[in-house]
């Protein structure tokens, strides 16, 4: 089976305001600068983030008008599928189990968020709904698929159906979510699309058992 969750460990706590974490790359870099300047964390602690690798909830992007310069209507539709809530809950409990091990006793003290008082499934579900945000790896908004797939925007050459030379080559072309971060897969897709556009034939398949180094 493929992994269902990814856990990110960050050696500092990103400050929160209200219910939503105020994480941004700039905030993270500022905290990093503070660590270097002061020789210690600006906000001492460790942050552990849970990422679902195969979320079941599906969002959408729709045109707001016929004007291509108007902003689209984006609905991430987070946690609309109850299975995501259940997967997050299992991951949350497992993460607590990890932090309770002897190896962490000398370095971890108080659970800042959502707090050690959050114990029941209902409380955990509420915390998940309040704290969940993007993992910055959205995919499949212009997905590739066969001619019989009405949800497929692109054909197998990355061309937008109904056009001749308009292609989309990025994570939105993924037919489905992959397990893990998308950077390497997007680079691979770009290389493949370049070969298709330049009409470069695929590499010959080789038997690794016959490859010499």
What is the predicted role of each segment?
Residues 1-185, 193-213:
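FAD-dependent oxidoreductase catalytic-site/capping-region signature
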């Amino acid at each position: 089976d493929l992994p269902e969750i990814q856990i990110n460990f960050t050696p500092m706590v990103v400050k929160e305001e209200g219910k939503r974490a105020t994480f941004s790359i700039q905030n993270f870099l500022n905290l990093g600068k503070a660590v270097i300047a002061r020789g210690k964390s600006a906000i001492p602690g460790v942050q552990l983030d849970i990422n679902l690798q195969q979320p079941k909830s599906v969002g959408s992007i729709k045109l707001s008008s016929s004007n291509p310069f108007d902003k689209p209507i984006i609905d991430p539709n987070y946690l609309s599928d109850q299975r995501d809530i259940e997967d997050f809950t299992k991951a949350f409990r497992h993460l607590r189990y990890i932090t309770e091990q002897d190896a962490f006793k000398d370095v971890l003290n108080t659970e800042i968020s959502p707090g050690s008082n959050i114990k029941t499934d209902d409380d955990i579900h509420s915390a998940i709904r309040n704290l969940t945000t993007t993992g910055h790896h959205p995919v499949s908004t212009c997905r590739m698929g066969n001619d019989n797939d009405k949800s497929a925007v692109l054909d197998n050459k990355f061309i937008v159906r109904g056009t001749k030379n308009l292609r989309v080559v990025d994570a939105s072309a993924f037919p489905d979510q992959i397990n893990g971060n998308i950077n390497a897969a997007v680079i691979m897709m770009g290389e493949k699309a370049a070969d298709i556009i330049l009409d470069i034939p695929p590499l010959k398949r080789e038997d690794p058992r016959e490859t010499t180094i």
